[in-house]
Design a protein with these regions (language model features):
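Active-site neighborhoods of divalent-metal-dependent phosphate/nucleic-acid chemistry enzymes
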Residues: 74-113
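Short, well-structured N-terminal submotif of metal-dependent ribonuclease cores
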Residues: 1-38, 53-62, 136-137
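Short, conserved alpha-helical segments within structured domains
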Residues: 38-42, 82
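Acidic, PIN/NYN-like endoribonuclease modules and their adjacent C-terminal/linker elements
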Residues: 1, 108-137
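Residues that scaffold the ATP/ADP-binding catalytic core of kinase and kinase-like folds
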Residues: 11-13, 49, 124
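Acidic active-site catalytic centers that drive phospho-/nucleotidyl reactions
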Residues: 5, 99, 118
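Active-site-proximal, substrate-binding regions of enzyme catalytic domains
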Residues: 47-72
Length: 137
């Protein structure tokens, strides 16, 4: 099981430097070849960044609708308690809130590997960060 950070989706949606390997990785999740989690917060973060980059409501709707077709993706719905506990991760690991939410969710779901380009996760001893390229995409 993997956890997908929002920057993987953003690489594709914003056609950034790692867009092709990120897209190939996401296709593997979409087909059900790989199983992964993300959170509703991380999906919201993708939408906010897309909007800030000038993406239209149609682009956002297409992105959100596409998530319904991901056979290998589960979306964890955060509670206020998860968010409170994430502040402890912020304190203990020196992470910002969205990264702390990812780590908190990973711990709760017993997921050890995050797919991300964010090197801040490398500070968390028990988390293994992989890029799509590391996974062969």
């Amino acid at each position: 099981m993997l956890f997908i950070d929002s920057n993987i989706f953003l690489e594709v949606e914003l056609a950034q430097e790692h867009g092709v390997p990120a897209k190939n990785f996401l296709k593997a999740v979409q087909s059900g070849r790989l199983d992964a989690y993300t959170t509703d917060f991380h999906i919201d973060n993708v939408v906010i960044v897309m909007e800030n980059y000038g993406k239209s409501w149609r682009d956002i709707a297409v992105f959100l609708t596409s998530l319904l077709q991901y056979r290998g993706l589960s979306i964890y719905h955060l509670t206020i308690y998860d968010k409170i506990e994430a502040t402890e991760v912020m304190r203990d690991e020196g992470l910002d809130f969205d990264d702390a939410l990812a780590v908190r969710t990973m711990k709760k779901l017993n997921i050890k590997v995050i797919v991300s380009y964010d090197k801040d996760f490398d500070r968390v001893k028990w988390v293994k960060r992989k890029t799509p390229e590391d996974l062969g995409f």
